[in-house]
Amino acid sequence: MANFKGHALPGSFFLVFGLWWSVKYPLRYLNSKVKGNCRSNKCYDRLELIEGILKALFSLIGILAEQFVPDGPHMHLVNGEDHSWVKLMNWQHTTMYLFYGISGVVDILTYFPLNLPRGLDRLSLGIAVIVEGLLFYYHVHNRPALDQHIHSLLLIAVFGCAISIMIEVFMRNDIVLELFRASLSILQGTWFWQIGFVLYPLGGAPEWNQTDHDNVMFITMCFCWHYAVALLIMAINYSLVYYCVNRHKKLPVIVDNGLIKINSKKAEVEASLLAGSDEE
């Protein structure tokens, strides 16, 4: 959709998944470092399954939104009267959602005992991100300078994310790569929203001059600010997860110490009773 909603929708999806990853991966990493932690990986496998279902569901919502909005193509690619293309921008967004939907289906299949190759879920996600980047690279040709530039900045986050995911295919459960991917996903989410605000101002806000070079300079600086905020969010979430994991780790120690004290007092009472009976 060539409007604000068409950018807010994918932005929301990327933001949700980026924020979720910024919590899930530190939680798994820090729990794995807890000595004597006997938790099974089944819990995290279920989370992967839920994540795959949500990814497929969000993709389906995106496809339906792009195709069946009032001014959408309604599954028509070619106009039957003059044989012209019908709403190719909507079709490009639909294609992007399609590949993310495939990634979600692969995540779901990975959960079941089908003996799928290890890393196939990451590979399918990496392909989806590459397709997204390819589509957006040819998305704004012959458009005003600011429009082209703001979309080209998005490609930095997209292809950076793709490279990270492709490395994850061979380096599974690497916390640095996972956090890097999460930060770039948050960046994609917030930047989609920024694109919407710049190209389609809301509430009667003044329109941006698409040919002013100062606007191009500001947008570049603004992109860096967005990533700084994404890194700040990552740091806050990691700190909160670290605090919660450490607090939970200390609870068994406190309980064990309490039981030791109770048992020692019980032993003292029994000893005193035995001593009293011996004297009698």
Swiss-Prot record:
Any Gene Ontology CC annotation: membrane
Localisation: Membrane
S-S pairs: none
Major localisation: membrane
Record keywords: Membrane, Transmembrane, Transmembrane helix
KW DNA damage (keyword) present: no
Entry membrane topology: Multi-pass membrane protein
Transmembrane residue ranges: 7-27, 49-69, 96-116, 120-140, 150-170, 184-204, 216-236
Any Pfam family: DUF716
Keyword Nucleus: no
Family membership: Belongs to the TMEM45 family.
UniProt-recorded name of the protein: Transmembrane protein 45B
Gene name of the record: tmem45b
